[in-house]
UniProtKB/Swiss-Prot annotation:
Family annotation (InterPro entries): Ribosomal_uL15/eL18_sf
Alphabetically ordered keywords of this record: Acetylation, Cytoplasm, Hydroxylation, Ribonucleoprotein, Ribosomal protein
Domain of life the protein comes from: Eukaryota
Record-listed N6-acetyllysine modification sites: 47
Residues with PTM (3S)-3-hydroxyhistidine: 39
Compartments where located: Cytoplasm
Name this polypeptide is given: Large ribosomal subunit protein uL15
Gene Ontology CC terms: cytoplasm; ribonucleoprotein complex; ribosome
Organism: Sus scrofa (Pig)
């Protein structure tokens, strides 16, 4: 019964594997640990550690 695969076969090994690029299921959305502190996590840092980034 390989016919079940047809729809998704081409998506194997692709970043957005049948889920689209938004709301993708990644292991570490936002990077690991403090990654992006300077960039996309800056809001939180400013809120709690004001002036941490200069």
């Amino acid at each position: 019964m390989p016919s079940r695969l047809r729809x998704t076969r081409k998506l194997r090994g692709h970043v957005s594997h049948g889920h689209g690029r938004i709301g993708k299921h990644r292991k570490h959305p936002g990077g690991r640990g403090n990654a992006g502190g300077m960039h996309h996590h800056r809001i939180n840092f400013d809120k709690y550690h004001x002036g941490y980034f200069g």
